[in-house]
Regions:
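Glycine-rich phosphate/diphosphate-binding loop of Rossmann-like nucleotide-binding domains
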Residues: 1-39
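Short glycine-rich anion-binding loops that position phosphate/pyrophosphate groups of nucleotides
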Residues: 10-11, 68-71
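Well-ordered alpha-helical segments embedded in enzymatic catalytic cores
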Residues: 24, 48-52
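Short beta->alpha junction loops
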Residues: 38-48
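Proline/glycine-rich low-complexity loops and linkers
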Residues: 48, 76-134
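An anion/phosphate-binding loop that grips the pyrophosphate of nucleotide cofactors and donors
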Residues: 60
Length: 134
């Protein structure tokens, strides 16, 4: 089975952050018998995300996306994915509760963009992350 990994984030392209996610994913996938055919890095740009998904669909059986989900006002990844897959964002109550618990454990207040982290595509399966960072 052929896999493509798409990494999203301007910070990756300008060298501000080193992409260790795709390297880790590729190794784990390879260890499980999957073949990563391509790793594509793109900016936080609606059209770049759509183009990367369209192109990857022609090459890969499985497409994995990492990045582009930071709690920033300019994040467009989720809305672009919803547009591409013809669905909408909904607030996931379990995810929101987990986010609230995390902030409480760190003694921090949530801001508007943190609430938006609980918004997920209505047709997705949420995979929770127990290893959170402040």
């Amino acid at each position: 089975m052929n896999v493509e990994i798409i990494t999203i984030g301007d910070e990756l392209l300008i060298g501000q952050v080193v992409d260790t996610n795709s390297a880790w994913m590729a190794k784990e996938l390879n260890d499980c018998g999957f073949r990563v055919k391509q790793i594509t890095s793109i900016s936080d740009d609606r059209q770049h995300i759509i183009n990367a998904l369209t192109e990857a669909q022609g090459r890969a059986d499985v497409i994995l996306i990492t990045g582009g989900l930071g709690p920033t006002r300019d994040d467009i990844t989720k809305t672009t994915l919803c547009e591409y897959f013809k669905t909408e964002l909904i607030q996931n109550k379990k995810v929101l509760k987990d986010i609230e618990s995390m902030f409480k454990s760190f003694g921090s207040e949530m801001i508007e963009t943190n609430w938006q982290q609980a918004d997920v595509p209505s047709n997705c399966k949420v995979i929770t992350n127990s290893k959170v960072t402040p």
